[in-house]
Amino acid sequence: AYKIEETCISCGACAAECPVNAIEQGDTIFVVNADTCIDCGNCANVCPVGAPVAE
């Protein structure tokens, strides 16, 4: 599953690209639901700051 690092700027690009809706706005940054994530990498591909990383 992917994890979103603290470099996240909360732009929402990742959530819009997630085919299984595994990403949502957290308290300060976006968060990935690891149980739902299918490791497709779409979030990492569209993130302008490279915050999503594979775990």
Swiss-Prot record:
Domain 4Fe-4S ferredoxin-type: 2-27, 28-55
Single annotated GO MF: electron transfer activity
Cysteine pairs bridged by disulfides in the record: none
Gene3D superfamilies for this protein: 3.30.70.20
Pfam families: Fer4_7
Ligand binding ([4Fe-4S] cluster 1): C8, C11, C14, C47
UniProt keyword annotation of tRNA-binding present: no
InterPro entries: 4Fe4S_Fe-S-bd (IPR017896), 4Fe4S_Fe_S_CS (IPR017900), 7Fe_ferredoxin (IPR000813), PSI_iron-sulfur_center (IPR050157)
Cofactor note: Binds 2 [4Fe-4S] clusters.
Record key words, sorted: 4Fe-4S, Electron transport, Iron, Iron-sulfur, Metal-binding, Repeat, Transport
Signal peptide as annotated in the record: none
Cofactor(s) the record lists: [4Fe-4S] cluster
Sequence positions that bind [4Fe-4S] cluster 2: C18, C37, C40, C43
Role: Ferredoxins are iron-sulfur proteins that transfer electrons in a wide variety of metabolic reactions.
Name of this chain's protein: Ferredoxin-1
Organism: Rhodospirillum rubrum
Organism placement in taxonomy: Bacteria, Pseudomonadati, Pseudomonadota, Alphaproteobacteria, Rhodospirillales
